[in-house]
């Protein structure tokens, strides 16, 4: 019986989605998973190929992968992704698009298997070292990682590229060669083609030694996670915001570790040391009467009520009006704000036949809301209700004609209150 080189101890799941580019590494992975399936008939195996459209050979690679999967009786999903310049660089953006497609393709109970190996681990470590990463970044890749509500497995992470080549030759496997892998303008290719061969010529076990260092860094991070768990519990609210008061008495090092872990929990990119310092100095310690904001790509960090918030950047809609001619159906909101819907059963009156329905994001004059005496301006109501400033011109306001009826999830006006049991509710799916 053929001895598999993949780490089968990872394969407790019986449903596996294998990332399959058609290159050497993923071909060996898929071949070994097919052999694993033969030994365990209860295993369900699928493959996914990502068509980036970057190479003129991309279509022929799809045909190659289809041929291989048909021969091995593995269902194949082909996902085409479009890459646009988002400032990350083509390598990072392609990876982001690839893993987004993986997440969308995974079925319930399925795990993702990818073909990274020991040489990849070494490259990842050195790239992190080049960026000046700390222990978290230098931990590189784990054999098992949380991903999209399931697991990402790397069963070949202990094997070298040479081992995979030997397996492929011995079993007569065919694979494709991506011409971009020979372009040393890409950092990873530079390491693989030029730097690592020199290092391995001098120190043959260099990749294995680097992998051990990555493992030690990962162990240090896990220990820190354990030691800081109580601090995190004290600092993080049920809304996922970060309380500032416990951080004030912490050392700089401890506070930075808490900030990093909070951002990781919010799925934010790992900040540099300079970025952490800016978060603390420019946002956390800003004047009490300020509304500080620090942008990170399409997200931002803000401070409100002595808490830090990690939020997606959304353009204010202060001047926007969205007509809702058929109010019985859901209405799509601008700027990715989601949808609103009027559903039966609630405390809002239905619109009269002559009243036009619209969604707006500002309301003039004094407003009289249910449960409050006297009139207030909208700004005062937002403050009383604890609505953060950045949500005040993106929270949908329901109007019948020129009359404000309700703010989604916040308040109902007296003019909008239902007088019978035929009321409706304004539901906002953000």
From Swiss-Prot:
UniProt cross-references to InterPro entries, sorted A to Z: Lysidine-tRNA-synth_C (IPR012796), Rossmann-like_a/b/a_fold (IPR014729), TilS/TtcA_N (IPR011063), tRNA_Ile_lys_synt (IPR012094), tRNA_Ile_lys_synt_N (IPR012795), tRNA_Ile_lys_synt_subst-bd (IPR015262)
Compartments in which it is found: Cytoplasm
Group of enzyme by EC: ligase
EC number: 6.3.4.19
Catalytic activity: cytidine(34) in tRNA(Ile2) + L-lysine + ATP = lysidine(34) in tRNA(Ile2) + AMP + diphosphate + H(+)
One Gene Ontology biological process: tRNA modification
One GO term describing the cellular component: cytoplasm
Residues that bind ATP: 21-26
Gene Ontology MF, one: ATP binding
UniProt main location, coarse: cytoplasm
PANTHER family per record: TRNA(ILE)-LYSIDINE SYNTHASE-RELATED
Cited NCBIfam families: lysidine_TilS_C, lysidine_TilS_N, PRK10660.1
Role this protein plays: Ligates lysine onto the cytidine present at position 34 of the AUA codon-specific tRNA(Ile) that contains the anticodon CAU, in an ATP-dependent manner. Cytidine is converted to lysidine, thus changing the amino acid specificity of the tRNA from methionine to isoleucine.
Name this protein carries in UniProt: tRNA(Ile)-lysidine synthase
Native organism taxonomy: Bacteria, Pseudomonadati, Pseudomonadota, Gammaproteobacteria, Enterobacterales
């Amino acid at each position: 019986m053929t001895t598999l080189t993949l780490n089968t101890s990872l394969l407790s799941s019986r449903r596996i989605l294998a990332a399959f580019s058609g290159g050497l590494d993923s071909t060996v992975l898929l071949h070994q998973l097919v052999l694993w399936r033969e030994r365990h008939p209860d295993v369900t195996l699928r493959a996914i190929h990502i068509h980036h459209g970057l190479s003129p050979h991309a279509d022929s690679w799809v045909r190659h992968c289809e041929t291989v999967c048909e021969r091995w009786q593995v269902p194949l999903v082909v996902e085409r992704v479009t890459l646009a310049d988002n400032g990350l660089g083509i390598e990072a953006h392609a990876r982001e698009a690839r893993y987004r497609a993986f997440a969308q393709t995974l079925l319930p109970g399925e795990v993702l298997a990818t073909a990274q190996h020991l040489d990849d681990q070494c490259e990842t470590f050195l790239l992190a070292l080049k960026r000046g990463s700390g222990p978290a970044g230098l931990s590189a890749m784990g054999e098992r990682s949380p991903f999209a509500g399931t697991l990402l497995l790397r069963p070949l992470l202990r094997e070298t590229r040479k081992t995979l080549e030997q397996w492929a030759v011995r079993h007569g496997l065919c694979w494709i060669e991506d011409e971009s892998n020979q372009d040393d303008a890409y950092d990873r290719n530079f390491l693989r083609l030029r730097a690592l061969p020199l290092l391995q010529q001098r120190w043959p076990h260099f990749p294995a030694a680097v992998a051990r260092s990555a493992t030690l860094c990962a162990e240090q991070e896990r220990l820190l996670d354990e030691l800081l768990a109580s601090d995190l519990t004290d600092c993080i609210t049920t809304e996922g915001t970060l309380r500032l008061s416990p951080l004030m008495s912490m050392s700089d090092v401890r506070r930075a570790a808490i900030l990093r872990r909070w951002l990781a929990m919010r799925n934010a990119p790992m900040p540099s040391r300079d970025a952490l310092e800016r978060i603390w100095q420019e946002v956390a310690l800003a004047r009490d009467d300020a509304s500080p904001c620090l942008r990170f790509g399409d997200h931002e960090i803000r401070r409100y009520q002595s808490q830090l918030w990690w939020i997606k950047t959304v353009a204010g809609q202060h001047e926007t009006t969205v007509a809702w001619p058929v109010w019985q159906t859901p209405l799509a909101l601008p700027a990715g704000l989601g949808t609103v819907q009027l559903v039966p059963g609630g405390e809002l009156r239905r619109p009269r036949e002559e009243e036009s329905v619209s969604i707006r994001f500002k309301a003039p004059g004094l407003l009289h809301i249910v449960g409050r005496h006297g009139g207030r301006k909208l700004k005062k109501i937002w403050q009383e209700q604890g609505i953060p400033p950045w949500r005040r011109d993106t929270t949908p306001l329901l109007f019948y004609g020129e009359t404000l009826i309700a703010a989604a999830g916040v308040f109902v006006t007296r003019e909008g209150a239902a007088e019978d049991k035929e009321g409706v509710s304004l539901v906002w799916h953000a």
